Amino acid sequence: MTFPISKLRVFVIAFFMMASVSVKAQQPGMQALIGQSLSKLQQPTPEAFLNSIAEMKRIDSMFPDSIQPKYQMALQSLNFSVMNPHAAQTDHLLAETEQTIAKMEQMKNSDPSDICTLRGFLFMVCIVQNPVQNGPRYYLNVMQDFEKALKLNPDNQLARQLQQKFLEGMRQQTGNQGE
């Protein structure tokens, strides 16, 4: 009688050990998939961005509780949109990105600095799409989001770079070359 119970215990213990190893192995697997996708952006063509976004969506469906695929999907969507503000896919990508950012905000392991950076970038892309209409509407949002991102994490290089690019672009648009 003890033999079947022992066998069952060994099976249960082995199952839980395999499950824990499998869970830990998912993270490196996810990182490898993300890295492979991003490596294809050596030539940042519109097609390369759209392919990367599609790959990030697949990775996100494989790892729905992870922030990283959502972050990369949003970031690549915004990169595509800022470089192609009037492309047919841009409005759809921006709407999806807004939803992705909202999902990320609800996740317990999200980085508030990254959320602010993405939101600021989203508003920045809206301004690039239509500066006359969206500039006055979103200028303050962009500035506040980048400032908040840098206040939360002074080492956030993406927020710093985007803020600098935004300020340079605004100076060029307003004709104010000095500061």
Positions of PLM-derived features:
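Ligand-binding pocket scaffold of soluble enzyme catalytic domains
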Residues: 2-5, 107-110, 114-115, 152, ...
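Bacterial Sec-dependent N-terminal signal peptides
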Residues: 1-33
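Helix-turn-helix repeat elements of alpha-solenoid scaffolds
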Residues: 42-56, 89-100, 136-141
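Hydrophobic, well-structured mid-protein blocks that either form specific transmembrane helices
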Residues: 94-145
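Amphipathic alpha-helical repeat scaffolds of TPR domains
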Residues: 27-40, 62-84, 109-130, 157-171
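TPR/TPR-like (Sel1-like) alpha-helical repeat modules
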Residues: 137-151, 157, 164, 168, ...
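Short coil/turn and helix-start
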Residues: 46-47, 83-92, 129-137, 172-176
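Canonical positions in the second alpha-helix
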Residues: 59, 104, 148-149
